[in-house]
């Protein structure tokens, strides 16, 4: 995996939270970006469970697909109160100028006593958004509004 085997790392940002996610494949960078985002909200190491939600989305480009993917997971957390810890992207494809993702996120019901809340994320932003293929895989830079 790129960057010495790291899945993600957090970077300095004045007001919000910025992270880089890495992956050998495009699917893996989407999975690791989701993990990085949820580790801002809670400690995913304390989450288990196999409550699953399927996510299928279509967007005009890969960068928008990444933002839509993370935003949908954030929405599911807020509405269904599920904390996710495992992400499996089954497919990302381009067809007729649009990109789509089919994935499954797994986790468990959110209980404040079991999952201490660390940071509230208001939104996933396009600010400083980057998604690029590198010599050794893929890299995504994401800023979330807190």
UniProtKB/Swiss-Prot annotation:
The lineage's top-level taxon is Archaea
One Gene Ontology term of the molecular function aspect: calcium ion binding
> What Pfam families does this protein map onto?
Archease
Q: Which positions, given as ranges, span the membrane?
A: none
Which Gene3D superfamilies does its entry note? Archease domain (3.55.10.10)
**Keywords in UniProt for this one?**
Calcium, Metal-binding, tRNA processing
Q: Which SUPFAM superfamilies match?
A: MTH1598-like
Q: Which residues bind Ca(2+)?
A: 16, 145-146
Question: Is RNA-binding tagged as a keyword?
Answer: no
Entry keyword Metal-binding: yes
Alphabetical GO biological process terms: tRNA splicing, via endonucleolytic cleavage and ligation
Explain the purpose of this protein: Activates the tRNA-splicing ligase complex by facilitating the enzymatic turnover of catalytic subunit RtcB. Acts by promoting the guanylylation of RtcB, a key intermediate step in tRNA ligation. Can also alter the NTP specificity of RtcB such that ATP, dGTP or ITP is used efficiently.
Q: Which HAMAP family match?
A: Archease_arch (MF_01222)
Task: State the family named in the UniProt similarity comment for this chain.
Answer: Belongs to the archease family.
Output this protein's name: Protein archease
Q: Which organism is it from?
A: Methanosarcina acetivorans (strain ATCC 35395 / DSM 2834 / JCM 12185 / C2A)
